[in-house]
Design a protein with these regions (language model features):
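Glycine-rich portal/gate segments that line the openings of hydrophobic small-molecule binding cavities
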Residues: 39-81, 137
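Beta-strand/loop substructures that line and gate deep hydrophobic ligand-binding cavities in soluble
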Residues: 82-129
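A generic structural micro-feature
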Residues: 1, 40, 55-61, 86-90, ...
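A conserved amphipathic terminal alpha-helix motif
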Residues: 116-152
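Solvent-exposed residues in well-ordered beta-strands and their adjoining turns
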Residues: 10-14, 51-55, 68-71, 81, ...
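Hydrophobic ligand-binding cavity/cleft-lining segments
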Residues: 1-45, 51-53, 141, 148-152
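Intrinsic-disorder/low-complexity, polar/charged segments enriched in Ser/Thr/Lys/Arg/Asp/Glu/Gln
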Residues: 2-8, 45-47, 60-62, 75, ...
Length: 152
């Protein structure tokens, strides 16, 4: 099943600070919902394990992420894939763009992914809703981290 998602978030920091935090494994681990481990194996590669629950399906996804087209502090592209065992798989990519706006940084993202296995059988609406909630939670946590205030 194909999935796309776009969005933008206004962050209270410079592009340089936002870019650095987007590449900091400790910040990402703290902000990604369900993230159990996140290891930076090179400046452009991460491996992670995250627990995910979508409807009745729970899974631990193990995956790898690669950063390409790095253009600090303007953005980059992300590609990756994750294996959730019998629950299924996810693979895809995203572009992330950082622009100065209103004394801070506007982060714009565009995600394209393929999902298979039991997760794909749950239906587009449920999967898209869960993906949107996960993205919203990540950016709420990330915005709190960038601004130096604790996440709710």
């Amino acid at each position: 099943m194909a999935m796309t998602m776009t969005g933008e978030v206004q962050l209270p920091a410079t592009r340089e600070v936002v870019f650095a935090k987007l590449n900091d494994p400790e910040v990402l681990k703290a902000c990604i919902p369900g993230c159990e481990t996140l290891v930076m194996s090179s400046p452009t590669e991460f491996s992670a394990v995250a627990a995910v629950k979508i409807g009745p399906v729970k899974a631990r996804f193990k995956g790898n992420v690669h950063l390409t087209d790095l253009d600090p502090p303007n953005g980059y592209k992300i590609s990756g894939e994750g294996d959730g065992g019998v629950a299924g798989f996810a693979k895809g990519g995203a572009s992330v763009t950082l622009t100065e706006k209103d004394g801070g940084t506007l982060l714009t993202y565009n995600v394209e992914a393929q999902i298979g296995g039991k997760l794909a059988q749950l239906g587009q609406r449920l999967v898209n809703g869960a993906a949107k909630k996960t993205a919203d939670d990540f950016f709420k946590n990330f915005a709190a981290n960038v601004s130096g205030t604790p996440a709710a």
